[in-house]
Amino acid sequence: MSIEDLARANVRALTPYQSARRLGGKGDVWLNANEFPTAVAFQLTAQTMNRYPEPQPKAVIESYARYADVKPEQVLVSRGADEGIELLIRAFCEPGKDALLYCPPTYGMYSVSAETIGVECRTVPTLADWQLDLPGIEAQLDGVKVVFVCSPNNPTGQIIDPQSIRDLLEMTRDKAIVVADEAYIEFCPQATLAGWLSDYPHLVVVRTLSKAFALAGLRCGFTLANAEVINVLLKVIAPYPLSTPVADIAAQALSAEGIAAMRQRVAQILDERRYLVEQLRGIACVEQVFDSEANYVLARITASSAVFKSLWDQGIILRDQNKQPSLSGCLRITIGTRAESQRVIDALTAENV
C-alpha cells in the first residue's frame, strides 16, 4: 500500500488550486495575481516573540471594525480571506450531507476548500452579462448551506447587482449563509454590503489586506458577520491564526496613516487602469476589454493561448482564463506600474495573429 492509498478518497481525487505562484514562470512583469506592484515598508514594533500571540488581536480587530464601520464583535481575523472561506464551509456544511453553491466564472478557492473537506459543490453559471441567475440558484438551493458571491467578481471585474444580492438574501433567509467575497472592495467602496449586516443575520462579508493594502505576503484577512456567526467560527478557527509580526503590521496598515496611504494607492491603480484600458482598446489582437471595478482587467484576445505563451516567453506573466466557463479567449491582466503596463501594450501591439 502506498502513502497515497492511505489518504482520504476525496483528497486523492483533488486537483490543487492553481495559484499564480504554483503556476510559476520566470518573468519580470508579474501581472497574474492581482497584487499591488510595489512593496510597502513597515517596521516591526512588537518585541514579544517569546509569547504566544492573542487569539484575535484586539488592536487589529478594533482598527478593522472602525475602518469597515462595524462593531468589533462582528469581526474575525484570519490567515487571509482564504482561511475565512474554509472556516465558513467547515463550520456550516456537514460533509456528505450539505452543499455549497457558487456561480462561475469566479474565484476557484470556493470549490477547492469544499472538495478538501468533502462537501458537495453546486454551480449555477452566471448569465451572459455575468450577473446572477436567480431562478437557477433557487432551483438548486435544497440542501445548500453556504452560497458564495464574489463582488467585484474575480476574474470578470464587475459588481454584482445589489438588488440581485438582496433577492438572494431573501431567498436564503433561514436556509443558508450568503458570503459576499469583497477582496477587491477598496477599488469600489460604494459597493460594500457591510452595512447590510443588521438587516440580514445570514450575510457574511470576507475581506483581505492582500490587494489595496499591498500586503499579499502578510496573509491577513477578515470575516465580517453578525456576532452569532462569528461565535460559531471562533469554535473552529486555530487558536493563534495571526503571528505577532503579522498582527503588528496589520495594525499599522489599519492606522489612520495606513488607510490614507491605501487610498492613495487605490487612486494610483484607478489611473493606471484607465490608461491600460484605453491603450488595449486600440490594439489589433484585442477583441474586447471588459469594464472592471477592480485592480485588473479582463480582455478577449485573438489566439489568446498563443499570445499568452508569447508574452510569457518575454517575461510578462498574465493569467489565462480560457478554462473558465464563458471566458474562452480571455486573459486577465493585473494593473501594475506604468512601465509594466507599457510592456504589455508594446508586446500585444507587436503580436501578428
Curated annotation (Swiss-Prot):
Key words of the record: Amino-acid biosynthesis, Aminotransferase, Histidine biosynthesis, Pyridoxal phosphate, Transferase
Pathway as given in its UniProt record: Amino-acid biosynthesis; L-histidine biosynthesis; L-histidine from 5-phospho-alpha-D-ribose 1-diphosphate: step 7/9
UniProt EC number: 2.6.1.9
Cofactor: pyridoxal 5'-phosphate
GO MF terms, alphabetically ordered: histidinol-phosphate transaminase activity; pyridoxal phosphate binding
Superkingdom per UniProt: Bacteria
Enzyme category, top tier: transferase
InterPro entries with a match to the protein in the record: Aminotrans_II_pyridoxalP_BS, Aminotransferase_I/II_large, HisP_aminotrans, PyrdxlP-dep_Trfase, PyrdxlP-dep_Trfase_major, PyrdxlP-dep_Trfase_small
Signal peptide: none
A GO biological-process term: L-histidine biosynthetic process
Catalytic activity line of the entry: L-histidinol phosphate + 2-oxoglutarate = 3-(imidazol-4-yl)-2-oxopropyl phosphate + L-glutamate
Annotated positions of the N6-(pyridoxal phosphate)lysine modification: K211
UniProt keyword annotation of Amino-acid biosynthesis present: yes
Subunit-level organization: Homodimer.
Protein family: Belongs to the class-II pyridoxal-phosphate-dependent aminotransferase family. Histidinol-phosphate aminotransferase subfamily.
Stored NCBIfam families: hisC (TIGR01141)
Name this protein carries in UniProt: Histidinol-phosphate aminotransferase
Species: Klebsiella pneumoniae (strain 342)
